From Swiss-Prot:
Larval storage protein (LSP) which may serve as a store of amino acids for synthesis of adult proteins. Belongs to the hemocyanin family. This is Larval serum protein 1 alpha chain. Larval hemolymph. Keywords: Secreted, Signal, Storage protein. One of its GO terms (molecular function) is nutrient reservoir activity. The gene is Lsp1alpha. It comes from Drosophila melanogaster (Fruit fly). PROSITE patterns: HEMOCYANIN_2. Heterohexamer, composed of three subunits, alpha, beta and gamma.
Length: 816
């Protein structure tokens, strides 16, 4: 969020530090606020019947007549026919964006939203769809429309994890949230407090027996971490650090050390997130939120002892909401069924950008694996066992649990052989195309695949999007692969829930990274046939990158509250027709973060010149401590920063902060807060700046660095200064970057060089090193924020959340 909270009371001008320019923040007018209010209310508790009388009356019809649309195509006709025949996916059924029939229907519904001539037509169709069409399909189509309609710039929906929390939190938490009853909660004890013995008394046998049974319920077994039984020393167990709350303690199980149970408790304090201090000192924000009853519940990540494997220790990362949301929104921005010409996606080099993101996400995942002593991502094969099983422990909103995969699962044995032949046939075909270096289309046209820009063609093929050449063949392979993983038949309509069928859930599964590694390998296979960069190509005459000083790199686990109010099942409260949002539910979870860091460049230049400065992060050693050669290691580097700068003649000292990174975002403003801001502005009490929340397309800033080690994990950074090569449109010149992602604008990228340059091609180390490059050895330290609580005698506030803990780590880790 790029504004100060004080701006809510008056319009101002802010400085966008990342881009070194002053930017006027736009403020919403009444018409905009009416639209924003509608979007927030129409997805409120989307699985439940619509309760807003205004929208119920509005949604009594759906405009199927062509005159209400700027374009009317075959998908819209087919959708209308399916609606008349009652052949649409029913409400309450699982929706999979990568299920063939679901995707076709979703495309038809999206077109009705996207091509609506005016807001009234759009709003009427949305209200009707909310009441009568499948919930998952509705949100999918609506999200695409809000992102891609040119006249919707600045309008937002709640984050996907706030619309459908069920896709991001385990079934135990979801069931507790959905059965939350405020009246019952008021009548019962606020806490079922499970205290440690605060006064350090030796327990009686009965108290020991109670604790022992609870320990069994938590699955802790009968032994200590030292192998000693509770029976032998139950009288002194409270005097040691081996109390059951610490027995199976992991960093993200913080509530055990505070004596809190996994149930709802109420706090009048502020919502936790990393930028909350911008708000909780502001009187307007405090006034706005004072009447909201806030309830919190600790939530864990999934760790299934029955399907335990080495990937289980990474669940805090693979199940991170920001990590999964990034992939979801990338595939909303560049949806496989949106053509590049109509939506302008070709202006953004959509195929290359999608494929480069696959590579970058795999690089980031690989670095997290190294933090835990794990090595390369395992190779994927359709004809070998998948060693790593996975149980997502998710439950769909219709009550059906997600399917799971056992360890050493054989894809070939349990699959549909016809589908498998088509999938493997595609993979073999594209590998042959890359090796041959050309492709002959059905009309006999020859396409040269030995040019660098041909990576766009390869990317479109691998994503299976509609811009792929011969898209009848290439478009469906990607969808078929995901359907095969989910054991879903080609013509199946009602599908069992599976994480691999939706973008927002698939990154939870270790198999995702194995499969997408096979996709990235085609990218590297293509690059193998391009000539290596020569010293002359890499050299920037007159520019020397003399030194880079990097500040301390520290990661830690912090706490955050995610808004899960959409899972409430109680009665909605209305006053004079106006909805009263009087209570909110929050999932309190521990997640990976890092201390802000910076680096300072010392660059000598022989002349004034506009340049682009790039920064990469990568491993230095493999899991066995062996140094990785640059030739092999180039594939493991992740680009963390790029920006333009005008060098002056002589020495240039440039300081760059992690908070300046253009591609990352902080925590998004919660659904509850956004709705209150909208209503207050609608009533004329506040101004509503359009940059009120972070753009949806940003990568989580807190996940830039891998976890690292307590003693320090050796890594390396690479920096390079290159001449500025202008893209088709200057970056951010055609859209407002403070609230828009500029999808299809052609102005998203800093220059026209290939993504990942200079690591995109294979390296000749004799030619590679030039004065405008700089390698820097760095160390990433992991700080244990819960360490002070390990000795229970130092903590006396059991059964309550310790807000001083949040203050302490905020001060310690967020200040440079």
């Amino acid at each position: 969020m790029k504004f100060a909270i004080a701006f809510l009371a008056c319009v101002a001008v802010v400085t966008a530090t990342a881009y070194h320019k002053t930017h006027d923040i736009k403020v919403a007018d009444k018409a905009f606020l009416m639209k924003q209010k509608f979007l927030f209310e129409i997805v409120y508790r989307v699985e439940d019947p619509l309760m807003f009388e205004e929208y119920i009356a509005m949604g009594k019809q759906f405009y199927f007549d062509k005159e209400h649309y700027t374009h009317f195509d075959l998908y819209m006709e087919k959708f209308f026919e399916a609606h008349k025949a009652h052949a649409l996916l029913p409400k309450g059924e699982f929706f999979g964006a990568l299920v063939k029939h679901h995707a076709k229907q979703a495309r038809g519904l999206f077109n009705f939203f996207y091509y609506a001539k005016d807001w009234e037509t759009f709003m009427t169709n949305v209200a009707f769809a909310r009441m009568h069409f499948n919930e998952g399909m509705f949100v999918y189509a609506l999200t695409l429309a809000v992102i891609h309609r040119d006249d919707f710039h600045g309008l937002v929906l709640p984050a996907i994890h706030e619309i459908f929390p069920q896709f991001f939190f385990n079934s135990k938490f979801v069931m507790e949230a959905e059965k939350f009853d405020y009246e019952m909660w008021m009548k019962t004890s606020l806490y079922e407090k499970e205290y440690m013995d605060v006064y350090h008394k030796i327990p009686t046998f009965s108290s020991y027996e109670h604790g022992y049974k609870q320990g069994m319920a938590y699955g802790y077994g009968k032994t200590h971490g030292h192998g000693q039984t509770y029976e032998h020393e139950f009288g002194s167990m409270y005097q040691t650090s081996d109390y059951m709350y610490m027995k199976d303690f992991k960093t993200w199980q913080w509530w055990k050390l505070m004596g809190l149970g996994e149930h709802w408790y109420s706090e009048s304090n502020y919502i936790l997130r990393e930028n909350i201090y911008e708000y909780n000192q502001e009187s307007n924000w405090l006034t706005m939120m004072k009447d909201v009853k806030k309830f919190y519940m600790p939530v864990d990540y999934s760790r299934d002892l029955y399907l335990y494997n080495e990937e289980s220790k990474l669940s805090y990362f693979t199940e991170d909401l920001g990590w999964n949301s990034y992939w979801y929104y990338l595939n909303m921005d560049y949806s496989f069924f949106l053509d590049g010409k109509t939506f302008g996606l070709q202006n953004d080099r959509r195929g290359e950008w999608w494929l480069y993101n696959v590579h970058q996400l795999l690089s980031r995942y690989h670095m997290e694996r190294l933090s835990h002593g794990l090595g390369e991502i395992p190779q994927f094969s359709w004809f070998h066992q998948i060693e790593m099983g996975y149980d997502p422990q998710l439950i769909y909103y219709n009550g059906i649990g997600y399917s799971y995969r056992k360890n050493y699962y054989e894809l070939e044995t349990y699959g549909n052989f016809e589908m498998l032949d088509k999938i493997t046939g595609f993979q073999q075909r594209i590998q042959n195309i890359v090796e041959l270096g050309y492709y002959q289309t059905t009309d006999g046209h020859m396409i040269d695949l030995r040019k660098p820009e041909s990576i766009e063609i390869i990317g479109n093929m691998l994503q299976g999007n509609v811009d792929a050449i011969d898209n009848i063949f290439f478009q469906f392979w990607y969808m078929l692969a995901h359907m095969y993983f989910a054991d879903t038949h080609y013509y199946q309509m009602e599908v069992y829930p599976n994480v691999m069928l939706n973008f927002e859930t698939m990154m939870r599964d270790p198999m995702f990274y194995m499969f997408y590694k096979s996709i990235a390998q085609v990218y590297f296979q293509f690059m193998h046939h391009l000539p290596k960069y020569t010293k002359e190509q890499l050299l920037m005459p007159g520019v020397t990158l003399k030194h880079v000083e990097v500040s301390e790199l520290v990661t830690y686990f912090d706490l955050v509250d995610f808004d899960v109010t959409n899972m409430l099942n109680g009665k909605m409260v209305f006053h004079e027709g106006q909805f009263l949002w009087d209570k909110s539910l929050f999932a309190r979870q521990m997640r990976l973060n890092h201390k802000p860091f910076s680096y300072t460049y010392t660059i000598d230049s022989a002349r004034d010149e506009k340049v682009v400065i790039r920064a990469f992060l990568g491993p230095k050693f493999d899991e066995y401590g062996r140094m990785i050669s640059l030739t092999d290691n180039r594939m493991n580097f992740m680009e963390i920063d790029e920006f333009t700068y005008t060098l002056k003649t002589g020495s240039n000292l440039i300081t760059r902060k992690s908070t300046d990174f253009a591609w990352t975002v902080k925590d998004r403003t919660t659904y509850t807060e956004l709705y209150y801001y909208t209503m207050m502005a609608f009533d004329g009490k506040y101004d509503y700046p359009l940059d009120l929340t972070e753009p949806h397309c940003g990568f989580p800033d807190r996940l830039v660095l891998p976890m690292g080690w307590k003693k320090g994990m050796p890594m390396q950074m690479f920096f390079m200064v290159v001449p500025y090569m202008a893209p088709q449109h200057e970056q951010f010149s055609t859209f407002d970057y403070t609230y828009s992602c500029g999808i299809g604008s052609g102005a998203r990228h800093v220059d026209s060089l290939p993504f990942g340059y200079p690591f995109d091609r294979e390296i000749n180390e004799y030619e590679f090193h030039v004065p405008n490059m700089y390698f820097k050895d760095v160390t990433i330290y992991h700080a244990d924020t819960m360490e002070k609580y390990y000795n229970y005698k130092e903590y006396t506030n059991y059964g309550h959340f310790d807000y001083s803990f949040f203050n302490d780590y905020y001060t310690k880790y967020f200040k440079l």
